[in-house]
């Protein structure tokens, strides 16, 4: 289930869920999981911790009472997702940079930014990496070529090429990281949502964007225990710093993704928000 909107009334919530469950049962569905808006590749999970922090780009937000409504409707926790906060003043350490250098030299890793002049070709590389590297993750749903193209078209206007990194070994792509400026910082100044003068106001406040969201970061399965993901994490932070970004949110990370949680810990990242997936 997804796109859940409800007043703080259990009877109303129950009516919504009962109707949805009945319809799904008629379609042969035996389990209901969510919120997914509309899938794991989009806005995912219910915010249960971190209500005092504003949502970053493409992350959901909801009233605190939603958890009670969902749980009282018979849903149980199936998985938690973490959002990590990183700041340029605390990310780096001699140990981290030393380990990163060892991994890069051992694996022969190099990094390059997205080539906007070959956007379609780059998109095919990233699509292949995404579907191969993420297929083993819990709840993974393969993205189709059309879905990837549609998402890329939506994001292209705000993409900063230097923040889209492709990791290579022997000139062969083995992983990538996609980070986007947190344009929510600027969007909040366009309260009426109008194109004009909202667009002018948005462009003016765009200068105030000092943070990014690390949306996806991963490597092919054969490199997932090599430390390559951690190196990609560090490389992203270093390039963001050169562009003047002071902080970042890495979201989201599965609670039992040991390697990614360990990488976040090595970079002194702070668990800032928790999102929950429910199932019944």
Q: Across the structure, where does each feature detected by a protein language model lie?
A:
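Acyltransferase donor/substrate-recognition loop-hinge adjacent to the catalytic core
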Residues: 60-139, 163
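Short loop segments at secondary-structure junctions
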Residues: 87-91, 170-171, 222
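Acyl-donor binding region in acyl/amide transferases
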Residues: 1-74, 190-267
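A conserved beta-strand-loop-helix scaffold within acyl/acetyltransferase catalytic domains
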Residues: 113-219
């Amino acid at each position: 289930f997804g796109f859940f909107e409800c007043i703080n009334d259990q009877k109303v919530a129950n009516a919504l869920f009962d109707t949805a469950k009945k319809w799904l049962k008629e379609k042969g569905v035996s389990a209901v999981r969510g919120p997914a808006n509309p899938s794991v590749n989009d806005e995912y999970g219910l915010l249960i911790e971190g209500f005092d922090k504003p949502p970053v780009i493409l992350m959901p937000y909801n009233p605190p009472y939603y958890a009670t409504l969902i749980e009282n409707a018979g849903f149980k926790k199936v998985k938690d997702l973490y959002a990590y906060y990183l700041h340029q003043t605390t990310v780096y350490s001699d140990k981290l940079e030393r380990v990163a250098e060892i991994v890069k030299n051992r694996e022969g890793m190099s990094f390059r930014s997205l080539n906007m002049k070959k956007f379609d070709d780059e998109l095919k590389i990233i699509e292949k990496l995404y579907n191969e590297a993420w297929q083993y993750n819990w709840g993974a749903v393969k993205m189709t070529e059309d879905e990837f193209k549609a998402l890329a078209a939506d994001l292209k206007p705000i993409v900063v090429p230097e923040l889209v990194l492709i990791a290579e070994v022997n000139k062969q792509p083995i992983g990538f990281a996609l980070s986007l400026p947190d344009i929510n910082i600027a969007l909040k100044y366009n309260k009426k949502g109008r194109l004009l003068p909202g667009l002018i106001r948005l462009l003016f406040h765009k200068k105030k964007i000092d943070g990014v969201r690390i949306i996806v970061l991963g490597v092919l399965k054969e490199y997932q225990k090599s430390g390559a993901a951690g190196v990609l994490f560090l490389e992203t932070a270093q390039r963001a710093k050169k562009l003047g970004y002071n902080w970042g949110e890495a979201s989201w990370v599965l609670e039992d993704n040991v390697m990614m949680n360990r990488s976040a810990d090595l970079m002194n990242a702070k668990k800032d928000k928790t999102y929950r997936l429910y199932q019944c």
